[in-house]
């Protein structure tokens, strides 16, 4: 099972990926985690990524694509994986398609969690309030203004992936505002049709 979860920040992608990982025993591949691992392992590509990050620059698609390709080849991905935070752009999606094709693989689904942005802001605010009430630490970017900026960035850069994957026939859209259990059940119906 090879899939991509799409949706803006706060849509519940991480929650759903965690449930899928537990149920199906496939890893959740996060771009950030993959970059950190490549740097820590001091692989050739990891050294290139570290040099770019140390210079305060964004890691190029070429480097990210290579790191993803190497990660997909790992034994724990033999039965599938969930991509989280990749691809972020249409060129990355096209590179992923070529990469998988070259390995004799293809995506099983691209699932977009459709959500109402105003409701997401309210959801984020209540999550912050709960964290504070429990005495927990709140991320510096967990405030309405920063969150709205992240939503705008998503809309501008990542949302075009919906059109791209709709065009390939791989996109499945579900209501991400439903309760966690309902969203999970809908994802299962898509992945394991009756």
UniProtKB/Swiss-Prot annotation:
Pathway linked to the protein: Purine metabolism; AMP biosynthesis via salvage pathway; AMP from ADP: step 1/1
UniProt GO cellular component terms: cytoplasm
Catalytic reaction equation(s): AMP + ATP = 2 ADP
Residues given in the record as AMP binding sites: 31, 36, 57-59, 85-88, 92, 139, 150
Gene Ontology BP terms: AMP salvage
Enzyme class (EC, first level): transferase
Spans annotated as NMP: 30-59
Superkingdom in the source lineage: Bacteria
Positions annotated to bind ATP: 10-15, 127, 178
MF GO annotations: adenylate kinase activity; ATP binding
Subcellular location: Cytoplasm
Listed EC numbers: 2.7.4.3
A Pfam family that the UniProt record links to this protein: ADK
Keyword line: ATP-binding, Cytoplasm, Kinase, Nucleotide biosynthesis, Nucleotide-binding, Transferase
Region (LID), start-end ranges: 126-142
SUPFAM superfamilies given in the database record: P-loop containing nucleoside triphosphate hydrolases
Subunit details: Monomer.
Physiological role: Catalyzes the reversible transfer of the terminal phosphate group between ATP and AMP. Plays an important role in cellular energy homeostasis and in adenine nucleotide metabolism.
Domain notes: Consists of three domains, a large central CORE domain and two small peripheral domains, NMPbind and LID, which undergo movements during catalysis. The LID domain closes over the site of phosphoryl transfer upon ATP binding. Assembling and dissambling the active center during each catalytic cycle provides an effective means to prevent ATP hydrolysis.
PANTHER family: NUCLEOTIDE KINASE
Family recorded in the similarity comment: Belongs to the adenylate kinase family.
Name the UniProt record assigns to this protein: Adenylate kinase
Annotated source species: Brucella suis (strain ATCC 23445 / NCTC 10510)
Protein encoded by which gene: adk
